[in-house]
Amino acid sequence: MNTLTLTPGHLSFAQLRAVWQQPVQLRLDSSAVDGINASVDCVNNIVAEGRTAYGINTGFGLLAQTRIATEDLQNLQRSLVLSHAAGIGEPLDDAMVRLIMVLKINSLARGFSGIRLSVIEALIALVNAEVWPLIPAKGSVGASGDLAPLAHMSLTLLGEGKARWQGEWLPAKEALKKAGLEPITLAAKEGLALLNGTQASTAFALRGLFEAQALFASAVVCGALTTEAVLGSRRPFDARIHAARGQRGQIDAAGLFRHVLTETSAIAQSHHNCEKVQDPYSLRCQPQVMGACLTQLRQAMEVLLVEANAVSDNPLVFAEEGDVISGGNFHAEPVAMAADNLALAIAEIGALSERRIALMMDKHMSQLPPFLVKNGGVNSGFMIAQVTAAALASENKALAHPHSVDSLPTSANQEDHVSMAPAAGRRLWEMAANTRGVIAVEWLAACQGIDLREGLTSSPLLEQARKALREQVPHYTQDRFFAPDIECATELLARGDLFRLLPDFL
Protein backbone atom coordinates (compact mmCIF):
# COMPACT_ATOMS: atom_id res chain seq x y z
CA MET A 1 0.00 0.00 0.00
CA ASN A 2 1.16 3.50 -0.86
CA THR A 3 2.08 5.72 2.11
CA LEU A 4 1.93 9.48 1.64
CA THR A 5 2.98 12.19 4.05
CA LEU A 6 0.99 15.15 2.83
CA THR A 7 2.69 18.53 2.85
CA PRO A 8 -0.21 20.76 1.78
CA GLY A 9 0.32 22.44 -1.57
CA HIS A 10 3.14 20.12 -2.63
CA LEU A 11 1.52 17.10 -4.26
CA SER A 12 3.52 15.93 -7.28
CA PHE A 13 2.15 14.48 -10.50
CA ALA A 14 3.62 11.09 -9.61
CA GLN A 15 1.94 11.19 -6.19
CA LEU A 16 -1.40 12.09 -7.75
CA ARG A 17 -1.12 9.19 -10.20
CA ALA A 18 -0.25 6.84 -7.33
CA VAL A 19 -3.29 8.00 -5.34
CA TRP A 20 -5.50 7.25 -8.35
CA GLN A 21 -3.94 3.85 -8.96
CA GLN A 22 -3.98 2.29 -5.51
CA PRO A 23 -5.13 2.74 -1.89
CA VAL A 24 -3.07 5.09 0.21
CA GLN A 25 -2.28 5.63 3.87
CA LEU A 26 -2.26 9.38 4.46
CA ARG A 27 -0.44 11.31 7.13
CA LEU A 28 -0.60 15.09 7.45
CA ASP A 29 2.77 16.79 7.83
CA SER A 30 2.97 18.63 11.15
CA SER A 31 4.01 21.84 9.38
CA ALA A 32 0.37 22.35 8.38
CA VAL A 33 -1.09 22.44 11.88
CA ASP A 34 -0.34 26.05 12.87
CA GLY A 35 -1.87 27.49 9.71
CA ILE A 36 -5.01 25.36 10.09
CA ASN A 37 -5.47 26.41 13.72
CA ALA A 38 -4.84 30.08 12.96
CA SER A 39 -7.59 30.12 10.32
CA VAL A 40 -10.04 28.53 12.77
CA ASP A 41 -9.16 31.13 15.41
CA CYS A 42 -9.91 33.87 12.87
CA VAL A 43 -13.36 32.41 12.17
CA ASN A 44 -14.09 32.01 15.88
CA ASN A 45 -13.13 35.64 16.51
CA ILE A 46 -15.54 36.84 13.82
CA VAL A 47 -18.36 34.83 15.40
CA ALA A 48 -17.50 36.05 18.91
CA GLU A 49 -17.34 39.68 17.81
CA GLY A 50 -20.64 39.46 15.94
CA ARG A 51 -19.17 40.60 12.62
CA THR A 52 -20.98 39.57 9.46
CA ALA A 53 -18.96 37.38 7.09
CA TYR A 54 -20.24 35.40 4.12
CA GLY A 55 -20.38 31.67 4.68
CA ILE A 56 -19.72 32.01 8.39
CA ASN A 57 -22.92 33.61 9.64
CA THR A 58 -24.88 34.26 6.43
CA GLY A 59 -26.89 32.26 3.94
CA PHE A 60 -25.41 31.09 0.66
CA GLY A 61 -25.63 32.06 -3.00
CA LEU A 62 -28.55 34.43 -3.56
CA LEU A 63 -29.34 34.11 0.18
CA ALA A 64 -25.98 35.59 1.16
CA GLN A 65 -27.67 38.72 2.52
CA THR A 66 -29.51 36.71 5.18
CA ARG A 67 -27.80 36.96 8.59
CA ILE A 68 -27.82 33.74 10.63
CA ALA A 69 -28.07 33.76 14.42
CA THR A 70 -25.11 32.37 16.35
CA GLU A 71 -27.17 29.54 17.84
CA ASP A 72 -28.07 28.36 14.32
CA LEU A 73 -24.54 28.20 12.88
CA GLN A 74 -24.01 24.47 13.42
CA ASN A 75 -27.41 23.68 11.92
CA LEU A 76 -26.60 26.02 9.01
CA GLN A 77 -23.56 23.95 8.05
CA ARG A 78 -25.37 20.62 8.39
CA SER A 79 -28.31 21.90 6.35
CA LEU A 80 -25.92 23.10 3.66
CA VAL A 81 -24.41 19.65 3.24
CA LEU A 82 -27.77 17.88 3.21
CA SER A 83 -29.44 20.26 0.75
CA HIS A 84 -26.49 20.38 -1.64
CA ALA A 85 -26.15 16.59 -1.87
CA ALA A 86 -28.35 16.58 -4.98
CA GLY A 87 -26.20 14.69 -7.47
CA ILE A 88 -27.40 12.10 -9.95
CA GLY A 89 -25.95 9.27 -11.99
CA GLU A 90 -23.77 6.25 -11.40
CA PRO A 91 -21.52 6.31 -8.32
CA LEU A 92 -17.90 7.20 -8.97
CA ASP A 93 -15.49 4.32 -8.53
CA ASP A 94 -13.27 4.05 -5.47
CA ALA A 95 -10.20 5.40 -7.27
CA MET A 96 -11.98 8.60 -8.28
CA VAL A 97 -13.48 9.12 -4.82
CA ARG A 98 -10.06 8.59 -3.26
CA LEU A 99 -8.46 11.14 -5.58
CA ILE A 100 -11.20 13.71 -4.87
CA MET A 101 -10.80 13.23 -1.12
CA VAL A 102 -7.02 13.56 -1.17
CA LEU A 103 -7.31 16.72 -3.27
CA LYS A 104 -9.83 18.12 -0.79
CA ILE A 105 -7.62 17.32 2.19
CA ASN A 106 -4.65 18.91 0.43
CA SER A 107 -6.61 22.12 -0.15
CA LEU A 108 -8.17 22.39 3.31
CA ALA A 109 -4.84 21.78 5.01
CA ARG A 110 -3.36 24.86 3.34
CA GLY A 111 -4.89 26.88 6.19
CA PHE A 112 -7.11 29.30 4.28
CA SER A 113 -10.45 27.59 4.92
CA GLY A 114 -11.21 28.03 8.62
CA ILE A 115 -11.85 24.34 9.15
CA ARG A 116 -10.71 22.51 12.28
CA LEU A 117 -7.84 20.05 12.23
CA SER A 118 -10.21 17.41 13.63
CA VAL A 119 -12.42 17.63 10.51
CA ILE A 120 -9.43 17.27 8.20
CA GLU A 121 -8.28 14.31 10.28
CA ALA A 122 -11.75 12.77 9.95
CA LEU A 123 -11.41 12.94 6.16
CA ILE A 124 -7.95 11.39 6.39
CA ALA A 125 -9.40 8.60 8.56
CA LEU A 126 -11.98 7.82 5.87
CA VAL A 127 -9.25 7.52 3.25
CA ASN A 128 -7.04 5.37 5.47
CA ALA A 129 -9.93 3.06 6.43
CA GLU A 130 -11.07 2.91 2.78
CA VAL A 131 -14.56 4.12 3.57
CA TRP A 132 -15.70 5.60 0.26
CA PRO A 133 -18.67 7.99 0.16
CA LEU A 134 -21.23 7.41 -2.58
CA ILE A 135 -20.63 10.31 -4.97
CA PRO A 136 -22.88 10.42 -8.06
CA ALA A 137 -20.98 11.27 -11.23
CA LYS A 138 -23.24 14.12 -12.34
CA GLY A 139 -24.63 17.30 -10.83
CA SER A 140 -21.85 19.90 -10.84
CA VAL A 141 -21.32 22.79 -13.25
CA GLY A 142 -17.86 23.62 -11.88
CA ALA A 143 -18.85 26.90 -10.15
CA SER A 144 -19.46 27.62 -7.27
CA GLY A 145 -17.06 24.75 -7.03
CA ASP A 146 -18.20 21.14 -7.22
CA LEU A 147 -20.98 21.57 -4.70
CA ALA A 148 -23.03 18.41 -5.24
CA PRO A 149 -20.15 15.90 -5.49
CA LEU A 150 -18.37 17.37 -2.47
CA ALA A 151 -21.63 17.47 -0.51
CA HIS A 152 -22.07 13.75 -1.15
CA MET A 153 -18.48 13.24 0.03
CA SER A 154 -19.21 15.24 3.18
CA LEU A 155 -22.42 13.35 4.00
CA THR A 156 -20.36 10.39 5.16
CA LEU A 157 -18.58 12.55 7.74
CA LEU A 158 -22.00 13.33 9.21
CA GLY A 159 -23.13 9.70 9.14
CA GLU A 160 -25.60 10.43 6.35
CA GLY A 161 -26.05 8.94 2.88
CA LYS A 162 -24.27 5.78 1.78
CA ALA A 163 -20.66 4.67 1.71
CA ARG A 164 -18.75 1.65 0.45
CA TRP A 165 -16.67 -0.34 2.89
CA GLN A 166 -14.90 -3.55 1.92
CA GLY A 167 -16.80 -3.61 -1.37
CA GLU A 168 -20.29 -3.28 0.14
CA TRP A 169 -22.65 -0.30 -0.01
CA LEU A 170 -23.89 0.51 3.49
CA PRO A 171 -25.66 3.35 5.27
CA ALA A 172 -22.83 5.76 6.07
CA LYS A 173 -23.35 5.50 9.83
CA GLU A 174 -23.00 1.71 9.62
CA ALA A 175 -19.92 1.94 7.39
CA LEU A 176 -18.30 4.33 9.88
CA LYS A 177 -19.07 1.99 12.77
CA LYS A 178 -17.62 -1.04 11.00
CA ALA A 179 -14.45 0.95 10.28
CA GLY A 180 -14.19 2.07 13.91
CA LEU A 181 -15.09 5.69 13.14
CA GLU A 182 -17.80 8.09 14.33
CA PRO A 183 -19.83 10.88 12.71
CA ILE A 184 -18.74 14.45 13.38
CA THR A 185 -20.53 17.76 13.92
CA LEU A 186 -19.57 20.75 11.79
CA ALA A 187 -18.81 24.20 13.20
CA ALA A 188 -19.08 27.64 11.59
CA LYS A 189 -17.95 27.74 7.93
CA GLU A 190 -16.90 24.08 7.86
CA GLY A 191 -19.71 22.80 5.65
CA LEU A 192 -19.02 25.50 3.09
CA ALA A 193 -15.27 24.79 3.23
CA LEU A 194 -15.94 21.13 2.48
CA LEU A 195 -18.32 21.83 -0.39
CA ASN A 196 -16.65 24.76 -2.10
CA GLY A 197 -13.75 23.82 -4.34
CA THR A 198 -12.75 22.37 -7.69
CA GLN A 199 -11.60 18.99 -6.41
CA ALA A 200 -14.09 16.84 -8.36
CA SER A 201 -13.46 18.76 -11.60
CA THR A 202 -9.71 18.47 -11.07
CA ALA A 203 -9.87 14.76 -10.29
CA PHE A 204 -11.98 14.11 -13.40
CA ALA A 205 -9.51 15.96 -15.62
CA LEU A 206 -6.51 14.34 -13.94
CA ARG A 207 -7.85 10.89 -14.73
CA GLY A 208 -8.24 12.03 -18.33
CA LEU A 209 -4.63 13.21 -18.31
CA PHE A 210 -3.35 9.96 -16.79
CA GLU A 211 -5.14 8.01 -19.51
CA ALA A 212 -4.03 10.39 -22.26
CA GLN A 213 -0.42 9.96 -21.17
CA ALA A 214 -0.65 6.18 -21.58
CA LEU A 215 -2.50 6.51 -24.89
CA PHE A 216 0.15 8.85 -26.25
CA ALA A 217 2.94 6.40 -25.42
CA SER A 218 1.00 3.45 -26.84
CA ALA A 219 0.28 5.34 -30.05
CA VAL A 220 3.96 6.20 -30.51
CA VAL A 221 4.88 2.52 -30.23
CA CYS A 222 2.06 1.39 -32.53
CA GLY A 223 2.81 4.17 -35.01
CA ALA A 224 6.40 2.97 -35.15
CA LEU A 225 5.23 -0.63 -35.60
CA THR A 226 3.02 0.46 -38.49
CA THR A 227 5.90 2.40 -40.03
CA GLU A 228 7.88 -0.83 -40.08
CA ALA A 229 4.94 -2.96 -41.26
CA VAL A 230 4.35 -0.82 -44.37
CA LEU A 231 8.07 -0.30 -45.06
CA GLY A 232 7.97 3.36 -44.08
CA SER A 233 11.02 5.59 -43.89
CA ARG A 234 12.88 6.64 -40.75
CA ARG A 235 14.02 9.85 -42.45
CA PRO A 236 11.02 11.96 -41.35
CA PHE A 237 12.12 11.45 -37.73
CA ASP A 238 15.55 13.01 -38.34
CA ALA A 239 16.26 15.46 -35.51
CA ARG A 240 17.40 18.17 -37.92
CA ILE A 241 13.94 18.51 -39.46
CA HIS A 242 12.31 19.15 -36.10
CA ALA A 243 15.03 21.43 -34.77
CA ALA A 244 14.50 23.63 -37.82
CA ARG A 245 10.88 24.19 -36.83
CA GLY A 246 11.58 24.57 -33.12
CA GLN A 247 8.34 23.23 -31.66
CA ARG A 248 9.40 21.51 -28.44
CA GLY A 249 6.61 18.92 -28.45
CA GLN A 250 7.42 17.96 -32.03
CA ILE A 251 11.16 17.74 -31.29
CA ASP A 252 10.53 15.46 -28.32
CA ALA A 253 7.96 13.32 -30.14
CA ALA A 254 10.43 12.72 -32.97
CA GLY A 255 12.97 11.70 -30.36
CA LEU A 256 10.55 9.13 -28.96
CA PHE A 257 10.03 7.64 -32.41
CA ARG A 258 13.79 7.42 -32.90
CA HIS A 259 14.04 5.77 -29.47
CA VAL A 260 11.68 2.93 -30.37
CA LEU A 261 12.66 2.55 -34.03
CA THR A 262 16.45 2.85 -33.50
CA GLU A 263 18.65 3.73 -36.47
CA THR A 264 17.79 0.66 -38.48
CA SER A 265 16.36 -2.86 -38.43
CA ALA A 266 16.20 -5.91 -40.64
CA ILE A 267 12.93 -4.57 -42.06
CA ALA A 268 14.48 -1.16 -42.75
CA GLN A 269 17.47 -2.75 -44.45
CA SER A 270 15.17 -4.77 -46.69
CA HIS A 271 13.88 -1.63 -48.45
CA HIS A 272 16.87 0.66 -48.02
CA ASN A 273 17.26 1.17 -51.78
CA CYS A 274 13.59 1.34 -52.71
CA GLU A 275 12.28 3.94 -55.16
CA LYS A 276 9.60 5.39 -52.86
CA VAL A 277 10.25 9.11 -52.22
CA GLN A 278 7.72 10.07 -49.54
CA ASP A 279 5.36 8.33 -47.14
CA PRO A 280 1.72 9.34 -46.58
CA TYR A 281 1.10 12.00 -43.94
CA SER A 282 -0.16 9.50 -41.36
CA LEU A 283 3.41 8.14 -41.25
CA ARG A 284 5.54 11.11 -42.25
CA CYS A 285 3.81 13.69 -40.05
CA GLN A 286 3.64 11.61 -36.88
CA PRO A 287 6.12 13.86 -35.02
CA GLN A 288 4.19 16.98 -36.00
CA VAL A 289 0.77 15.66 -34.99
CA MET A 290 1.89 13.73 -31.93
CA GLY A 291 4.15 16.61 -30.94
CA ALA A 292 1.17 18.97 -30.93
CA CYS A 293 -0.69 16.46 -28.76
CA LEU A 294 2.28 16.20 -26.42
CA THR A 295 2.28 19.97 -26.01
CA GLN A 296 -1.39 19.86 -24.98
CA LEU A 297 -0.67 17.10 -22.46
CA ARG A 298 2.16 19.10 -20.94
CA GLN A 299 0.13 22.28 -20.71
CA ALA A 300 -2.75 20.39 -19.12
CA MET A 301 -0.40 18.82 -16.60
CA GLU A 302 0.94 22.25 -15.64
CA VAL A 303 -2.55 23.67 -15.10
CA LEU A 304 -3.91 20.62 -13.28
CA LEU A 305 -0.90 20.28 -11.01
CA VAL A 306 -1.37 23.89 -9.90
CA GLU A 307 -5.09 23.29 -9.35
CA ALA A 308 -4.46 20.07 -7.43
CA ASN A 309 -2.44 22.09 -4.93
CA ALA A 310 -4.66 25.17 -4.99
CA VAL A 311 -7.00 26.71 -2.46
CA SER A 312 -10.33 26.90 -4.28
CA ASP A 313 -12.56 27.56 -1.29
CA ASN A 314 -14.69 30.68 -0.81
CA PRO A 315 -14.52 32.82 1.20
CA LEU A 316 -10.84 32.58 2.08
CA VAL A 317 -9.50 33.17 5.57
CA PHE A 318 -6.33 35.26 5.83
CA ALA A 319 -5.55 34.67 9.47
CA GLU A 320 -2.52 36.93 9.72
CA GLU A 321 -4.57 39.98 8.76
CA GLY A 322 -7.79 38.73 10.36
CA ASP A 323 -9.59 39.02 7.02
CA VAL A 324 -12.22 36.82 5.41
CA ILE A 325 -12.56 37.72 1.73
CA SER A 326 -15.06 36.50 -0.84
CA GLY A 327 -13.65 35.76 -4.27
CA GLY A 328 -14.04 33.25 -7.07
CA ASN A 329 -11.32 30.61 -6.77
CA PHE A 330 -14.08 28.00 -6.97
CA HIS A 331 -14.57 28.79 -10.67
CA ALA A 332 -13.03 25.84 -12.52
CA GLU A 333 -12.45 27.58 -15.86
CA PRO A 334 -8.72 26.68 -15.92
CA VAL A 335 -9.64 23.03 -15.41
CA ALA A 336 -12.35 23.14 -18.07
CA MET A 337 -10.01 24.61 -20.66
CA ALA A 338 -7.28 22.10 -19.80
CA ALA A 339 -9.80 19.28 -20.20
CA ASP A 340 -11.00 20.69 -23.53
CA ASN A 341 -7.44 20.72 -24.82
CA LEU A 342 -6.89 17.17 -23.58
CA ALA A 343 -9.99 16.17 -25.53
CA LEU A 344 -8.44 17.52 -28.72
CA ALA A 345 -5.26 15.56 -28.06
CA ILE A 346 -7.06 12.30 -27.27
CA ALA A 347 -9.21 12.66 -30.39
CA GLU A 348 -6.21 13.37 -32.63
CA ILE A 349 -4.15 10.51 -31.22
CA GLY A 350 -7.00 8.17 -32.13
CA ALA A 351 -7.69 9.81 -35.49
CA LEU A 352 -4.07 9.44 -36.62
CA SER A 353 -3.97 5.83 -35.44
CA GLU A 354 -7.13 5.06 -37.42
CA ARG A 355 -5.58 6.52 -40.57
CA ARG A 356 -2.56 4.27 -40.18
CA ILE A 357 -4.88 1.27 -39.82
CA ALA A 358 -6.64 2.28 -43.03
CA LEU A 359 -3.26 2.57 -44.75
CA MET A 360 -2.45 -1.03 -43.84
CA MET A 361 -5.72 -2.25 -45.34
CA ASP A 362 -4.84 -0.90 -48.81
CA LYS A 363 -2.56 -3.31 -50.64
CA HIS A 364 -1.36 -0.56 -52.98
CA MET A 365 -0.21 1.62 -50.08
CA SER A 366 1.04 -1.07 -47.71
CA GLN A 367 2.55 -3.62 -50.09
CA LEU A 368 0.83 -6.23 -47.92
CA PRO A 369 -2.05 -8.63 -48.67
CA PRO A 370 -5.45 -6.88 -48.70
CA PHE A 371 -6.80 -6.51 -45.17
CA LEU A 372 -3.66 -8.20 -43.85
CA VAL A 373 -4.71 -11.77 -44.51
CA LYS A 374 -3.82 -14.40 -47.09
CA ASN A 375 -6.45 -16.01 -49.28
CA GLY A 376 -8.51 -12.83 -49.40
CA GLY A 377 -12.09 -13.30 -50.46
CA VAL A 378 -12.46 -16.44 -48.42
CA ASN A 379 -10.94 -14.43 -45.57
CA SER A 380 -11.93 -10.83 -44.76
CA GLY A 381 -9.09 -10.27 -42.31
CA PHE A 382 -9.02 -6.84 -40.66
CA MET A 383 -11.75 -5.35 -42.89
CA ILE A 384 -14.33 -4.76 -40.15
CA ALA A 385 -11.80 -4.18 -37.39
CA GLN A 386 -10.81 -1.06 -39.33
CA VAL A 387 -14.48 -0.07 -39.54
CA THR A 388 -14.71 -0.39 -35.76
CA ALA A 389 -11.68 1.87 -35.39
CA ALA A 390 -13.29 4.39 -37.74
CA ALA A 391 -16.49 4.35 -35.67
CA LEU A 392 -14.57 5.01 -32.46
CA ALA A 393 -12.51 7.80 -33.99
CA SER A 394 -15.68 9.41 -35.32
CA GLU A 395 -17.39 9.31 -31.91
CA ASN A 396 -14.46 11.19 -30.44
CA LYS A 397 -14.87 14.02 -32.91
CA ALA A 398 -18.26 14.84 -31.40
CA LEU A 399 -17.06 14.26 -27.84
CA ALA A 400 -14.18 16.70 -28.39
CA HIS A 401 -16.61 19.64 -28.59
CA PRO A 402 -15.44 22.21 -26.01
CA HIS A 403 -17.37 22.44 -22.74
CA SER A 404 -15.69 25.58 -21.42
CA VAL A 405 -17.58 27.78 -23.89
CA ASP A 406 -20.88 26.53 -22.50
CA SER A 407 -22.50 28.21 -19.52
CA LEU A 408 -25.92 28.22 -17.88
CA PRO A 409 -26.72 30.63 -15.05
CA THR A 410 -27.63 29.06 -11.71
CA SER A 411 -28.75 30.14 -8.23
CA ALA A 412 -31.27 32.69 -9.51
CA ASN A 413 -28.59 34.38 -11.65
CA GLN A 414 -26.26 35.02 -8.71
CA GLU A 415 -23.95 32.39 -10.19
CA ASP A 416 -24.39 33.57 -13.75
CA HIS A 417 -21.30 32.14 -15.45
CA VAL A 418 -20.04 28.62 -14.85
CA SER A 419 -17.23 26.46 -16.24
CA MET A 420 -18.82 23.07 -16.99
CA ALA A 421 -15.45 21.60 -15.97
CA PRO A 422 -16.87 18.36 -14.51
CA ALA A 423 -18.48 17.39 -17.82
CA ALA A 424 -15.35 18.53 -19.66
CA GLY A 425 -13.26 16.16 -17.57
CA ARG A 426 -15.67 13.26 -17.34
CA ARG A 427 -16.15 12.87 -21.12
CA LEU A 428 -12.37 12.34 -21.38
CA TRP A 429 -12.84 8.88 -19.89
CA GLU A 430 -15.14 7.80 -22.73
CA MET A 431 -12.84 9.38 -25.28
CA ALA A 432 -9.85 7.56 -23.79
CA ALA A 433 -11.70 4.24 -23.99
CA ASN A 434 -12.50 4.93 -27.65
CA THR A 435 -8.93 5.82 -28.52
CA ARG A 436 -7.63 2.81 -26.61
CA GLY A 437 -9.85 0.66 -28.82
CA VAL A 438 -8.46 2.28 -31.96
CA ILE A 439 -4.87 1.77 -30.83
CA ALA A 440 -5.64 -1.84 -29.92
CA VAL A 441 -6.75 -2.47 -33.51
CA GLU A 442 -3.60 -0.78 -34.82
CA TRP A 443 -1.41 -2.90 -32.55
CA LEU A 444 -3.07 -6.06 -33.85
CA ALA A 445 -2.81 -4.89 -37.46
CA ALA A 446 0.79 -3.69 -37.28
CA CYS A 447 1.97 -6.93 -35.68
CA GLN A 448 0.12 -8.88 -38.37
CA GLY A 449 1.80 -6.74 -41.01
CA ILE A 450 5.26 -7.37 -39.58
CA ASP A 451 4.48 -11.08 -39.32
CA LEU A 452 3.75 -11.02 -43.04
CA ARG A 453 7.27 -9.67 -43.71
CA GLU A 454 8.34 -13.24 -43.18
CA GLY A 455 11.79 -13.65 -41.68
CA LEU A 456 12.28 -9.90 -41.06
CA THR A 457 12.36 -8.27 -37.64
CA SER A 458 12.05 -4.76 -36.31
CA SER A 459 13.98 -2.93 -33.58
CA PRO A 460 14.47 -4.54 -30.14
CA LEU A 461 11.80 -2.41 -28.44
CA LEU A 462 9.28 -2.96 -31.20
CA GLU A 463 9.95 -6.68 -31.11
CA GLN A 464 9.17 -6.51 -27.38
CA ALA A 465 5.86 -4.87 -28.26
CA ARG A 466 5.13 -7.58 -30.84
CA LYS A 467 6.06 -10.36 -28.44
CA ALA A 468 3.82 -8.91 -25.69
CA LEU A 469 0.86 -9.14 -28.05
CA ARG A 470 1.75 -12.47 -29.61
CA GLU A 471 1.95 -14.10 -26.17
CA GLN A 472 -1.79 -13.46 -25.90
CA VAL A 473 -3.05 -13.19 -29.48
CA PRO A 474 -1.81 -15.54 -32.23
CA HIS A 475 -1.12 -14.60 -35.85
CA TYR A 476 -4.10 -14.64 -38.21
CA THR A 477 -3.78 -17.43 -40.76
CA GLN A 478 -7.51 -17.35 -41.45
CA ASP A 479 -10.61 -15.58 -40.16
CA ARG A 480 -11.70 -16.16 -36.57
CA PHE A 481 -13.92 -14.47 -33.98
CA PHE A 482 -12.24 -11.05 -33.88
CA ALA A 483 -13.77 -9.20 -30.92
CA PRO A 484 -11.93 -11.18 -28.20
CA ASP A 485 -8.60 -10.24 -29.77
CA ILE A 486 -9.47 -6.54 -29.71
CA GLU A 487 -10.60 -6.91 -26.11
CA CYS A 488 -7.35 -8.64 -25.17
CA ALA A 489 -5.21 -5.98 -26.83
CA THR A 490 -7.26 -3.27 -25.14
CA GLU A 491 -6.68 -4.86 -21.74
CA LEU A 492 -2.94 -5.06 -22.38
CA LEU A 493 -2.90 -1.37 -23.28
CA ALA A 494 -4.84 -0.48 -20.13
CA ARG A 495 -2.31 -2.49 -18.15
CA GLY A 496 0.49 -0.35 -19.56
CA ASP A 497 2.34 -2.95 -21.64
CA LEU A 498 3.33 -0.36 -24.27
CA PHE A 499 3.42 2.69 -21.98
CA ARG A 500 6.36 1.26 -20.08
CA LEU A 501 8.47 0.96 -23.25
CA LEU A 502 8.98 4.75 -23.39
CA PRO A 503 11.01 6.98 -21.08
CA ASP A 504 9.17 9.72 -19.19
CA PHE A 505 8.08 12.39 -21.67
CA LEU A 506 5.82 14.77 -19.73
Curated annotation (Swiss-Prot):
Q: Where in the cell is it found?
A: Cytoplasm
Claim: Lyase is one of the keywords in the record: yes
* Catalytic reaction annotation: L-histidine = trans-urocanate + NH4(+)
Name the Pfam families on file.
Lyase_aromatic
Q: Which family does it belong to?
A: Belongs to the PAL/histidase family.
Q: PANTHER family, from UniProt?
A: HISTIDINE AMMONIA-LYASE
- Name of the featured protein: Histidine ammonia-lyase
Species source reads: Citrobacter koseri (strain ATCC BAA-895 / CDC 4225-83 / SGSC4696)
